[in-house]
Amino acid sequence: MEVILLERISKLGQMGETVKVRDGFARNYLLPLGKALRANAANKARFESERATLEARNLERKSEAQKVADVLDGKSFIVVRSAGETGQLYGSVAARDVVEVLAAEGFNIGRNQVHLNTPIKAIGLHKVELQLHAEVEINIELNVARSAEEAERQAKGEELTSVDAIYGVDEDALRPEDFFDPEADGLDENEA
């Protein structure tokens, strides 16, 4: 099916272009969301008459997205989750969780604007891409940790997945030489 794009769609085309797409993509996504019109003579004339208002509306949306992007770009957010000693989460951090964290900070971002290839399943610092507008993409950093204190340590660059990092190094721990002394058992060094 041929459609006229009413806004820029990534990997498809710019506003005003007539592109050929699969019927299901047009019927289920582009047409219901108002991102495109069927390509026929009446709709082409309608698009040309409304082009100025569509471009103004698109420019307004882009400027709003750019304002949010200027505030969010490169910012770090802390996500506290339960995890095992190896740093493996007992669940995962998905796009829904990213939206909740951003909403708690006062940013209204939709789930479809968060681009995670796979859910986050380990503690650490993770980059997350947000597409606020077809022409505005930014990256934020998620600091996934077991607690706020661990998040601070992680932000400083400490490794938190080893047992020593979690529990600390015990200086008073017993060593094997404390239990076994070859001289005390009456063995010569040659026999041992």
UniProtKB/Swiss-Prot annotation:
The keyword RNA-binding applies. Keywords: Ribonucleoprotein, Ribosomal protein, RNA-binding, rRNA-binding. One of its GO terms (molecular function) is structural constituent of ribosome. Residues 179-192 have a biased composition (Acidic residues). The keyword Ribosomal protein applies. PROSITE patterns: RIBOSOMAL_L9 (PS00651). GO terms for cellular component: ribonucleoprotein complex; ribosome. Pfam families: Ribosomal_L9_C, Ribosomal_L9_N. Residues 173-192 are annotated as: Disordered. InterPro entries: Ribosomal_bL9, Ribosomal_bL9/RNase_H1_N, Ribosomal_bL9_bac/chp, Ribosomal_bL9_C, Ribosomal_bL9_C_sf, Ribosomal_bL9_N, Ribosomal_bL9_N_sf. GO terms for biological process: translation. Belongs to the bacterial ribosomal protein bL9 family. Binds to the 23S rRNA. This is Large ribosomal subunit protein bL9. It comes from Rhizobium etli (strain ATCC 51251 / DSM 11541 / JCM 21823 / NBRC 15573 / CFN 42). The lineage of its organism: Bacteria, Pseudomonadati, Pseudomonadota, Alphaproteobacteria, Hyphomicrobiales. The gene is rplI.
